[in-house]
Amino acid sequence: MSDDAFLPLTSITDGLGCTLLLIEQAGRPDVWRNGKKHDGGGQFGMSANARGAWAGWGSIGFGPSGADGVSAATGDATDCTVNCNNWFGIYGFHHGGAHSLLCDGAVRFVSPTLSPLTFAYLSNRDDGRLVSAAEF
């Protein structure tokens, strides 16, 4: 999907309450990992993908990381989706989770126990994987 493409709500076939619209990624443009600010890194600097704090770098893609908030996800139980880092994942300064907005307008406080697979299902609008409220 390109930046200027229109996507009607009717194209979200997995359900508006099962699809992420926005996720919290607090602390930008600084780099945060597991509740600690890190100097350097500069991944939020001006680049072809930089579009401002509200629709910037993270509007391109997001996903889980390793438990340390730095390494890539490995596909096992140590992968982290919430409050690991503010590069790709859901990140907030709240104890026990961060906020996400679903396409139906509901705001959910998502805990760090959110599985990477459930995160992927919530990120896709038409993959046929319906996510129950108990899963996140």
Model-assigned labels for residue ranges:
Residues 1-136:
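Surface-exposed loop/linker segments characteristic of extracytoplasmic
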